[in-house]
From Swiss-Prot:
Signal peptide interval: none
Annotated localization: Cytoplasm; Secreted; Cell surface
Entry similarity comment: Belongs to the enolase family.
Keywords: Cytoplasm, Glycolysis, Lyase, Magnesium, Metal-binding, Secreted
Annotated source species: Acidothermus cellulolyticus (strain ATCC 43068 / DSM 8971 / 11B)
Protein name: Enolase
InterPro entries: Enolase, Enolase-like_C_sf, Enolase-like_N, Enolase_C, Enolase_CS, Enolase_N, Mandelate_racemase_C
Cofactor binding note: Binds a second Mg(2+) ion via substrate during catalysis.
Gene: eno
Length: 429
């Protein structure tokens, strides 16, 4: 047993300068586990609710109430628990909150405790977190889905699509994939400078130039891939996160200033897929446009990965609905959307059992916490989205994956092209 002896929490800052919750758990053998909770800018309406103070401090975004929930309400209930009983502990946290969306205690309070307990238990067992959570079969290093051009809610620009990403599918190892991404990222900066475009960074480390339209972003990325010495679609593919809920108004999608129906937007995506080496479309339609999603999946699901983020919010009930109604073929996994470690693992397992792919994801407001890197390997997810190879809160996750690959040594496998149906020759699920 590794008995929980004490729990503490504090208010710290995330990468956007907003407060977030950090939790420390002390075990009876002296082991300390620490975890910090991320926060999103583009959030789904059905996510677990983070608790904010709503007072004059930090523009209402303080988290003293969540910190107090940890120390005054959660700690007395779980001190004395065996930290290795993660599922029992997480169930107790859910029961203690008593709401369907964790709004009483706050998902930021609950997740902070859940993550810190997992880390403490892993350290107490002298196991890396990925091995503790994933067992002996955890071995697959994920393709880094690098957001190198930002638009939408992540940048002050006139590009509607929120993220333009690169996927180094042709690399043999994660370390090599990271190099592919970094070299392309630097090449993109040179391309932007050469065009007289801004090279300021968005929330997730990607560049945020003012561009005329969304296709220009893809064209610039393809140019950068070539400039870096790589082959588009062979060495490096591209992907987008449209975050379509953000430009959905009164039953229409306002894209590039034009209102479009779901059917018209689907045709737009079909044209993009035909024109570019796209392997993944995330949130291409709004979070409640289930009919549109079904049409899109029927049209493109056999060709490219269609990732549900806002529509699924890492919630097993919504994921199950998607599986039953043939919506999407992949799930974005964010720990703070659901609020505990075990619920996150359950969501991944549910997706994999149904043949859906999974992508473990950061949030736009991040910290130096590297839990998601370990979760990506623990679950053999095959993909991770944690921003550009810039800004230390993003790079921390990549560096952790380098360490994990080194530790796995000959057992390590890089997901590579096999993670995506378009160029792997497999079905999309």
């Amino acid at each position: 047993m590794a008995v929980i002896e004490a729990i503490g929490a504090r208010e710290i800052l995330d990468s956007r300068g907003n407060p977030t919750v950090e939790v420390e758990v002390l075990l009876d053998d002296g082991t300390v586990g620490r975890a910090a909770v991320p926060s999103g800018a583009s959030t789904g309406a059905f996510e677990a609710v983070e608790k904010r103070d709503g007072d004059d401090r930090y523009g209402g975004k303080g988290v003293r109430q969540a910190v107090q929930a940890v120390t005054d309400q959660i700690a007395p209930e779980i001190i004395g628990f065996d930290a290795t009983e993660q599922r029992v502990l997480d169930a107790r946290l859910i029961e203690l909150d008593g709401t369907p969306n964790k709004s009483r205690l706050g998902a930021n309070a609950i997740l902070g405790v859940s993550m810190a307990v997992a880390r403490a238990a892993a350290d107490s067992a002298d196991l890396p977190l990925f091995r503790y959570l994933g067992g002996p079969n955890a071995h697959l290093l994920p393709v880094p889905m690098m957001n190198i051009l930002n638009g939408g809610a992540h940048a002050d620009s006139n590009v509607d699509i929120q993220e333009f990403l690169i996927a180094p599918i042709g690399a043999a190892t994660f370390a090599e994939a990271l190099r592919y991404g970094v070299e392309t990222y630097h090449a993109l900066k040179a391309v932007l400078k050469g065009r007289g475009l801004a090279t300021g960074l968005g929330d997730e480390g990607g560049f945020a130039p003012n561009l005329a339209h969304n296709r220009e972003a893809l064209d610039l990325i393809l140019e950068a891939i070539g400039k870096a010495g790589f082959r588009p679609g062979r060495d490096i593919a591209v992907a987008i996160d449209a975050a379509a809920t953000e430009f959905y108004r009164d039953g229409r999608y306002i894209l590039e200033g034009q209102p479009r129906t779901a059917a018209e937007l689907i045709r737009y995506y079909e044209e993009l897929v035909a024109s570019y080496p796209l392997v993944s479309l995330e949130d291409p339609l709004a979070e409640e446009d289930w009919d549109g999603w079904r049409e899109l999946t029927a049209a493109l699901g056999g060709t490219v990965q269609l990732v549900g983020d806002d529509i699924f919010v890492t919630n097993p009930e919504r994921i199950s609905r998607g599986i039953q109604t043939s919506v999407a073929n992949a799930v974005l996994i964010k720990l703070n959307q659901i609020g505990t470690v075990t619920e996150t693992l359950d969501a991944v397992e549910l997706a994999h059992r149904a043949g859906y792919r999974t992508m473990i994801s950061h949030r736009s407001g991040e910290t130096e916490d590297t839990t998601i890197a370990d979760v990506a390997v623990a679950t053999n997810a095959g993909q991770i989205k944690t921003g550009a190879p810039a800004r230390s809160e993003r790079v921390a996750k990549y560096n952790q994956l380098l360490r994990i690959e080194e530790e796995l040594d000959d057992a390590a496998r890089y997901a590579g092209v096999a993670a995506f149906p378009r160029f792997a020759g497999g079905s999309a699920g």
